[in-house]
Curated annotation (Swiss-Prot):
Disulfide bonds: none annotated. Homodimer. InterPro entries: NagB/RpiA_transferase-like, Ribose-5P_isomerase, Ribose5P_isomerase_typA_subgr, Ribose5P_isomerase_type_A. It comes from Afipia carboxidovorans (strain ATCC 49405 / DSM 1227 / KCTC 32145 / OM5). GO terms for biological process: pentose-phosphate shunt, non-oxidative branch. Catalyzes the reversible conversion of ribose-5-phosphate to ribulose 5-phosphate. This is Ribose-5-phosphate isomerase A. The gene is rpiA. Belongs to the ribose 5-phosphate isomerase family. It is an enzyme of class 5 (isomerase). PANTHER family: RIBOSE-5-PHOSPHATE ISOMERASE 3, CHLOROPLASTIC-RELATED (PTHR43748:SF3). Pathway: Carbohydrate degradation; pentose phosphate pathway; D-ribose 5-phosphate from D-ribulose 5-phosphate (non-oxidative stage): step 1/1.
Amino acid sequence: MSKEELKRAAAARALEYVSDGMQLGLGTGSTAKHFVELLGERVRAGLRVVGVPTSEGTRADAERCGVPLTTLDDVDHLDLTVDGADEIAPSLDVIKGGGGALLREKIVAAASTRMVVISDDSKWVETLGRFPLPVEVIPFGLGATRRALATAFAEAGVTGEITLRQGPDGHAFVTDGGHWILDAHLGRIPEPPRLAALLSAIPGVVEHGLFIGLAKTAILAGSQGIRIVDRPRGRV
């Protein structure tokens, strides 16, 4: 199977977690797009759900596929969020944000009773960090924020190049919230919860791509089939 076929297989399995009447968080990225498309097929067959999109791109996909939408202002909770991931550790802590939607993705995930991450099995890693860690920042004071990030990385025992993400036009990539993204090429993050706390304390940092304690289940598609991993007992 191709990588896209594996992503679609993981998305199809995630549909088994969806029940009639659910309020859903709809993730962003290529794997989440497969889920939205398959969900649309179920909706056309009579499934009643509403979704909260995590990006303008996902909103457009959901509207195209006929998935009814709502907002977090109009519902008091979400039953389930299904989203992709850039890296998944055995703890089910993940790195997300390669598509630039990490702020809305984290807000939606935190508002959900359950978060399921879906991917092909190449995203499964023993230690997070090979994928660049996205940090969403306010454009104002960028130099000061970069210096504070470097200090936080050193305190967490990691180091690496910090680059400003660029869009197709060669200018700074702008998120749906009007912010910029710094990508930290760290290689390895031995203590993700500690680094997450340090990053969250930096003025100028809006959000970061470490999703700690949010995912409850991972669905991984590989050449040997589907593997389902639940968060280890004792983890928050």
